[in-house]
Amino acid sequence: MELLYQLAWLIPVLPLFGATVVGIGLISFNQATNKLRQINAVFIISCLGAALVMSGALLWDQIQGHASYAQMIEWASAGSFHLEMGYVIDHLSALMLVIVTSVALLVMIYTDGYMAHDPGYVRFYAYLSLFASSMLGLVISPNLVQVYIFWELVGMCSYLLIGFWYDRKAAADACQKAFVTNRVGDFGLLLGILGLYWATGSFDFGTIGERLEGLVSSGVLSGAIAAILAILVFLGPVAKSAQFPLHVWLPDAMEGPTPISALIHAATMVAAGVFLVARMYPVFEPIPVVMNTIAFTGCFTAFLGATIALTQNDIKKGLAYSTISQLGYMVMAMGIGAYSAGLFHLMTHAYFKAMLFLCSGSVIHGMEGVVGHDPILAQDMRIMGGLRKYMPITATCFLIGTLAICGIPPFAGFWSKDEILGLAFQANPLLWFVGWATAGMTAFYMFRMYFMTFEGGFRGNDQEAKDGVLQFYGLLPNFGPGAMNVKELDHEAGHDDHGHSSEPHESPLTMTFPLMALAVPSVLIGLLGRPWANQFEAFIHAPGEVVEHAAEFEWGEFYVMAGNSIGIALIGITVASLMYWQHKFDPKVLAEKFPSLYQLSLNKWYFDDLYDKLFVQGSRRVARQIMEVDYKVIDGAVNLTGLVTLVSGEGLKYLENGRAQFYALIVFGAVLGFVIVFSLT
């Protein structure tokens, strides 16, 4: 087994090798590489499959009690400065390796069906493999410098994949927005890393925590400075995990192809922020103000994401705001000291949210056969309905994911979310109440999505409904790449003339198999965290923490907390059923009764508008003023210098006439002038 640990560096290198080989092929032999599309896909999937096998073996060995393993080499040295690079395999990294490789493998299989007709099929696989390599490198990083390197690489891959369809303006704008927003958090992270090194002289997670605590307790370092440095580091996870106020990029990231929405923006990259908080736990935990900041940031983000998701009509954006909300739960858990609970929810959420996103892609794939390849129409739930009849596998898997995220037992989300709420009640009842209310909203908007998409009658052939959607957005149809028939771009003509069917269809096996595979952990994996026999907590717990099991499990307390969680979820489900399935209440009446709240949710709390006015328009105004200064002052000074040189040159050229007696006269005049001046003084 020691050989496996010594070769663990291959886990991130294998997908990197796949991406490199295919990438070189695309650059050097583009046409030939694209013709061998499925061979390239199988090659990349095989590389990742090998990484999954190695990751699974490492996780199993860690479960059996193998000690943590670290392999380091000295990368840079100058005097007392030593920087080491390498990898570490411990309980947390082994778990994350399996999560990343398993979800990535299923997403790559799914991609073969979803991107089958896209001309960028091979390029997409190369990007996916590069991302998988970067994410795997991140989770085995032993220090902050290496984390930061891979942190930026996953950000770059996110940029490439969000803007994959770069000829669509919305996608090009979205990848820039994601990149710029994440740079704000990453700048804070970089400052925090440098500040912590200045204070402690180390980049190692555990060493930083020990030394920082010692410096603060001895009075050498101010507690306020330590808190500021820790909060600067936390800015990185705030951006990467889409926490308030840097959450605005994630919904726009849905402009990328759906497989990357599942892999990057639901299961792995956005969870990297929570992972970094876990790694930095020895630094954060001793500083109460930092822990409170983390807890309340997560709590407010969970509430914010849920309130916006209530009114979303785009199926992917609804899931995006749901992701923001669930990430808020994880961050809140880390802030209240519920280390194990936060990471448990990270694991369960990775599987059921990846499945939900892939289900949404399956729905979009089916809808495109009816409404065409305009993402506005193909993704809007108002023209779906009744899809359970046509897409039973997708509908069943989406229902499983919905029950899991709503916290209905025995599905995975119940055990992880209920544990967070129970510990939040012990830490701060206010945090519990907000989380509890958010759980009710989660149940409402998720079943709203399910009922609007899969129940009732199919509305995809209703031209009036489609026109209403286009009118709502105030946009003309915007057909994206991937249309299989040029005639499909003619939106106004009838469907029969364009090869469109009048009914959606179930997706191929390459797309439905990953859904069914992800449904298994979405149902069963939560049982690892049963509170009376919490195997997950026994395996994953905070550094230095000793897990103590109570002699007797408090069933009464469990029934009260679980009953509250299930009760609020059932209320949310019931309200959604009455509105969107049984149609006992008209949601429009409620929107008209509370127009301010409805508009607040529909307009995403106006954060995009506020940021546009403050930062986008504000920076443009500043840029225009700087341009005026540059034009009038800087350019004026430069031009004036040139003018003075020109005029003086024009004047002086007449002195250079080539006559010696004229030069002698000038010399005589100059000498005479000096004599007169000195005689007077």
Swiss-Prot record:
Keyword DNA-binding attached: no
Database matches in InterPro entries: NADH_UbQ_OxRdtase_chlpt_su5_C, NADHpl_OxRdtase_5_subgr, ND/Mrp_TM, NU5C-like, Proton_antipo_N
Enzyme class: translocase
Catalytic activity entry: a plastoquinone + NADH + (n+1) H(+)(in) = a plastoquinol + NAD(+) + n H(+)(out); a plastoquinone + NADPH + (n+1) H(+)(in) = a plastoquinol + NADP(+) + n H(+)(out)
EC number, UniProt record: 7.1.1.-
UniProt topology in membrane: Multi-pass membrane protein
GO molecular function: NADH dehydrogenase (ubiquinone) activity; quinone binding
Keywords: Cell membrane, Membrane, NAD, NADP, Plastoquinone, Quinone, Translocase, Transmembrane, Transmembrane helix
Transmembrane spans: 7-27, 39-59, 89-109, 120-140, 144-164, 188-208, 219-239, 258-278, 289-309, 327-347, 352-372, 395-415, 420-440, 509-529, 558-578, 660-680
One Pfam match: Proton_antipo_M
Purpose of the protein: NDH-1 shuttles electrons from NAD(P)H, via FMN and iron-sulfur (Fe-S) centers, to quinones in the respiratory chain. The immediate electron acceptor for the enzyme in this species is believed to be plastoquinone. Couples the redox reaction to proton translocation (for every two electrons transferred, four hydrogen ions are translocated across the cytoplasmic membrane), and thus conserves the redox energy in a proton gradient.
Family of the protein in this entry: Belongs to the complex I subunit 5 family.
Protein name as annotated: NAD(P)H-quinone oxidoreductase chain 5
Species of origin: Synechocystis sp. (strain ATCC 27184 / PCC 6803 / Kazusa)
Designated gene of the protein: ndhF
